[in-house]
Amino acid sequence: MSKNYHIAVLPGDGIGPEVMTQALKVLNAVRNRFAMRITTSHYDVGGAAIDNHGQPLPPATVEGCEQADAVLFGSVGGPKWEHLPPDQQPERGALLPLRKRFKLFSNLRPAKLYQGLEAFCPLRADIAANGFDILCVRELTGGIYFGQPKGREGSGQYEKAFDTEVYHRFEIERIARIAFESARKRRHKVTSIDKANVLQSSILWREIVNEIATEYPDVELAHMYIDNATMQLIKDPSQFDVLLCSNLFGDILSDECAMITGSMGMLPSASLNEQGFGLYEPAGGSAPDIAGKNIANPIAQILSLALLLRYSLDADDAACAIERAINRALEEGIRTGDLARGAAAVSTDEMGDIIARYVAEGV
């Protein structure tokens, strides 16, 4: 008998609800094809929760997430709520507390250039022609964003500001294992990013990554300085499989990886804790300017579902089925407006229907 799974669904604001609808169509196709027992419950979050409950992250939403095996998150935010104090706005008041509550220490951001979308890549045509499929694994809870001491002091010419880059052994060990385990499901290569020629924290990072690598003899390990990595991503992104990054370096490189794909509407992300519980969401924003027009690209949300199946439900076959369905749709020239460039475009609903059908048919 298959295991019972439960997913907390948080559609959010802007295009969130309409792209989430498409992901749930695909989930239904997965359930039927793979005989998976998956239930869902919907909860308000972000601006929708402010409107309905007076706060961006109501207790009922937190409780619903606690009872789930994973969270499928849409997007939050919009001009309607920008007048609120920063900690009460949808982004800071919902997403950051969820990450803290569930101790989500690792962020996974795939960046793939799909066949047929090379023209959207801002790199030279000969580089784009090689394609790329990169997974950026970023540590989320340590490093310079959280290290102490930090602050400002002094005045006049002696005024100064300071931050502290701090990493503990356990933080490096656990994010390194995420990267190596991910590489085992991909092309068996990890490139660890640091600045070990200057920073003590990076020296420790490199030492510990080397130690963890001995547990994965089937995975190739390379080290690269952050400044060189930013250049190599532009020069030849196809050389990379899994990028292992600290919080700061991952923040930079994951956005660079996203940019060279040419479309934020294609980029999912996952944030995981040590127990495998995860929050899965598109990398783009709520796009309130196109909300409700049935023109948003739902692929990032659907790919976020694929990540959920792979990392939290250990259903790699189902995740691969979704990815193959998306590949087929794109190979056939099926595009939403953001990718059409003057050609005929399908609606949000139509793209969801097509991908769900391809999953059901086992393309």
Swiss-Prot record:
Residues bound to NAD(+): 78-91, 285-297
Site (Important for catalysis): 145, 195
Coiled-coil blocks: none
Places the protein is found: Cytoplasm
Catalytic activity: (2R,3S)-3-isopropylmalate + NAD(+) = 4-methyl-2-oxopentanoate + CO2 + NADH
GO MF term set: 3-isopropylmalate dehydrogenase activity; magnesium ion binding; NAD binding
Pathway(s) annotated for this protein in UniProt: Amino-acid biosynthesis; L-leucine biosynthesis; L-leucine from 3-methyl-2-oxobutanoate: step 3/4
One biological process term in Gene Ontology: L-leucine biosynthetic process
UniProt KW keywords: Amino-acid biosynthesis, Branched-chain amino acid biosynthesis, Cytoplasm, Leucine biosynthesis, Magnesium, Manganese, Metal-binding, NAD, Oxidoreductase
Xref: Gene3D superfamilies: Isopropylmalate Dehydrogenase
Cofactor stoichiometry and binding remark: Binds 1 Mg(2+) or Mn(2+) ion per subunit.
GO cellular component: cytosol
Top-level taxonomic group: Bacteria
EC number of this enzyme: 1.1.1.85
Alphabetical list of InterPro entries matching this protein: IsoCit/isopropylmalate_DH_CS, IsoPropMal-DH-like_dom, Isopropylmalate_DH
Chief site of localization: cytoplasm
HAMAP family linked to this entry: LeuB_type1
NCBIfam families: leuB
Binding partners and assembly: Homodimer.
Function: Catalyzes the oxidation of 3-carboxy-2-hydroxy-4-methylpentanoate (3-isopropylmalate) to 3-carboxy-4-methyl-2-oxopentanoate. The product decarboxylates to 4-methyl-2 oxopentanoate.
Family: Belongs to the isocitrate and isopropylmalate dehydrogenases family. LeuB type 1 subfamily.
Name of the protein in its database record: 3-isopropylmalate dehydrogenase
The species this protein was found in: Shigella sonnei (strain Ss046)
